[in-house]
């Protein structure tokens, strides 16, 4: 991936095998580009909790996120609650985090920041 375009404008590419697993140096470079997201599971996953006023807005966000996930062919694990969604990205095919996780994290944050569900 090129760092010349913002992550939220990039698109996911098929990534398989440990060659695509991000190392510590690359994780350190990419994490500041997705504010609010945290490394979890010893750097094997990327997580963030998004909060909403009610269940309707929570589910509207989940449905919009499902469309992004389908379009990018990269799907998060979701914990859906009345007023929040916990989003977790990891690339199973590489055994950890890939650039696809950061691309989708940026797209997810952009969706939330745009107030699509407000």
Curated annotation (Swiss-Prot):
SUPFAM superfamilies: PCD-like (SSF55248). Its EC number is 4.2.1.96. This is Putative pterin-4-alpha-carbinolamine dehydratase. It catalyses: (4aS,6R)-4a-hydroxy-L-erythro-5,6,7,8-tetrahydrobiopterin = (6R)-L-erythro-6,7-dihydrobiopterin + H2O. InterPro entries: PCD_sf, Pterin_deHydtase. One of its GO terms (biological process) is tetrahydrobiopterin biosynthetic process. The lineage of its organism: Bacteria, Pseudomonadati, Pseudomonadota, Gammaproteobacteria, Lysobacterales. Belongs to the pterin-4-alpha-carbinolamine dehydratase family. Gene3D superfamilies: Transcriptional coactivator/pterin dehydratase (3.30.1360.20). It holds the Pfam family Pterin_4a. PANTHER family: PTERIN-4-ALPHA-CARBINOLAMINE DEHYDRATASE. Keywords: Lyase.
């Amino acid at each position: 991936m090129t760092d010349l375009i913002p992550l939220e404008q990039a698109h996911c590419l098929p990534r398989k095998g440990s060659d695509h697993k991000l190392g510590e140096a690359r994780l350190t470079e990419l994490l500041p580009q997705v504010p609010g997201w945290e490394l979890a599971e010893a750097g094997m996953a990327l997580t963030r909790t998004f909060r909403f006023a009610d269940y309707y807005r929570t589910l509207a966000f989940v449905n919009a996120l499902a469309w992004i996930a389908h379009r990018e062919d990269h799907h998060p694990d979701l914990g859906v609650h009345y007023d929040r969604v916990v989003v977790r990205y990891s690339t199973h095919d590489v055994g950890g985090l890939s650039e696809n996780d950061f691309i989708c994290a940026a797209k997810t944050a952009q969706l939330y920041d745009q107030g699509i569900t407000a």
